[in-house]
From Swiss-Prot:
The lineage of its organism: Eukaryota, Metazoa, Chordata, Craniata, Vertebrata. Changing residue 238 to Q: In CFM2; decreased transcription factor activity; decreased localization to the nucleus. It is linked to Craniofacial microsomia 2: A form of craniofacial microsomia, a disorder characterized by a spectrum of craniofacial malformations ranging from isolated microtia with or without aural atresia to underdevelopment of the mandible, maxilla, orbit, facial soft tissue, and/or facial nerve. Most CFM2 patients exhibit isolated unilateral or bilateral grade II/III microtia, with or without atresia, although some patients show only minor external ear defects. Mandibular hypoplasia, micrognathia, and dental anomalies have also been observed. This is Forkhead box protein I3. CDD domains: FH_FOXI1. GO terms for molecular function: DNA-binding transcription factor activity, RNA polymerase II-specific; RNA polymerase II cis-regulatory region sequence-specific DNA binding. Residues 294-306 have a biased composition (Polar residues).
Length: 420
């Protein structure tokens, strides 16, 4: 038997060729000294020789079927007996294709075997894995998690009940019976079911009747939330709930501000604390704090400075044009006080600035700030008519509160009641 690709590189042997004894005797000879292959080397092998090229579904190459059967017996052992007519073929040798058809049948690599239950004492072997022995749809459902949230599972269980109410144990039973995936480990998903029942507003707890035996309350589905479960998917509507909560908060804050305003107008006490002042209650959360700054100027010792500032006089004069109750507030002017440009807002000559006069103009202050802060809030503080702080570490009462009221720049300053 000789080799095709040389003495050292041949892999497939060809039977019927002379042995390479002559070439092996002189390993150091150059390649030219070797005898070339003749035409007899490429001739067909004898019929009785074993052919290593085997086909499972047909005869061997270059030999009759009897030689192929002998070679197959040498490699695979004795062939199994032929199956009876109409029966399935063996796992390795498939029957030849019918005459007139093209293609060949391919044998399976492994036959599906039934799953053997693994004993709890010993772990499952390699042949007992579930993905190798998958034989039914139930086995597939045990491996794949259902594409439903826990809220959707609870809603399915409640809607499947005749009375549309179930206890917690019945919800567990429905989920485990409907979805085999949850039959494996019950600790994790049962905790999630309890959390969703407690935290989701769509599920309401109904106490059990006295004549109803058993224990545990019933759980029902809110009728308003039935449309939120579309094909098993729970659609949350958090935006509407947040908007409703914001609306109730704003309404509560408005009523509280009105009560504070009425109490502040009724009592004309100057030494009112800052937490209960009407200017603090009327201050909006999204706008600057002009009432807070006004209150701070009232409690600061720089009261006489208000009388010598023409900008403040012009500011109050612009507020007087927007005031509705100017005729009523005119009667509250005190004798011997200095006029600030707004009817009803009077400053005593002693220099003490009462918060009562500020509370009368606080409503107009808010209206003016809301109308002008959006359009003129981007202007630089360079054009502000109020001077900056020049004293030590203390800030001026006009440093920040009125910077957004830039419409004062375009007004003409009256000289009445002001000291220049």
């Amino acid at each position: 038997m000789a080799l095709y690709c040389g003495d050292n590189f041949g892999v497939y042997s060809q039977p019927g060729l002379p042995p390479p004894a002559a070439t092996a005797a002189a390993p150091g000879a150059p390649p030219a000294a070797r005898a070339p292959y003749g035409l007899a080397d490429y001739a067909a092998p004898p019929a009785a020789a074993a052919n290593p090229y085997l086909w499972l579904n047909g005869p061997g190459v270059g030999g009759p079927p009897s030689a192929a059967a002998a070679a197959a017996a040498a490699y695979l052992g004795a062939p199994p007996p032929p199956p009876p007519p109409g029966a399935a073929a063996g796992p390795f040798l498939q029957p030849p294709p019918a005459a007139g058809t093209f293609g060949c049948s391919q044998r399976p690599f492994a036959q599906p075997a039934p799953a053997a239950p693994a004993s709890p004492a010993a772990p499952a072997g390699p042949g007992e894995l579930g993905w190798l022995s998958m034989a039914s749809r139930e086995d597939l459902m045990k491996m794949v998690r259902p594409p439903y949230s826990y809220s959707a599972l609870i809603a399915m269980a409640i809607q499947s009940a005749p009375e549309r109410k179930l206890t917690l144990s019945h919800i567990y039973q429905f989920v485990a019976d409907s979805f085999p995936f949850y039959q494996r480990s019950k600790a994790g998903w049962q905790n999630s079911i309890r959390h969703n029942l407690s935290l989701n507003d769509c599920f309401k707890k109904v106490p059990r009747d006295e004549d109803d035996p058993g224990k545990g309350n019933y759980w029902t589905l809110d009728p308003n939330c039935e449309k939120m479960f579309d094909n098993g998917n729970f659609r949350r509507k958090r935006k509407r709930r947040s908007e409703a909560s914001n609306g109730s908060t704003v309404a509560a804050g408005t009523s509280k501000s009105e009560e504070g305003l009425s109490s502040g107008l009724g009592s004309g006490v100057g030494g009112k604390p800052e937490e209960e002042s009407p200017s603090t209650l009327l201050r909006p959360s999204h706008s600057p704090e002009p009432p807070e700054g006004t209150k701070s100027t009232a409690s600061s010792p720089g009261g006489p400075m208000l009388t010598s500032t023409p900008c403040l006089n012009t500011f109050f004069s612009s507020l007087s044009s927007l005031s509705v109750s100017s005729s009523v507030s005119t009667q509250r002017a005190l004798p011997g006080s200095r006029h600030l440009g707004i009817q009803g807002a009077q400053l005593p000559s002693s220099g003490v600035f009462s918060p009562t006069s500020i509370s009368e103009a606080s409503a107009d202050t808010l209206q003016l700030s809301n109308s002008t802060s959006n359009s003129t809030g981007q202007r630089s503080s360079y054009y502000s008519p109020f001077p900056a702080s020049t004293s030590g570490g203390q800030s001026s009462p006009f440093s920040s509160p009125f910077h957004n009221f830039s419409m004062v720049n375009s007004l003409i300053y009256p000289r009445e009641g002001s000291e220049v």
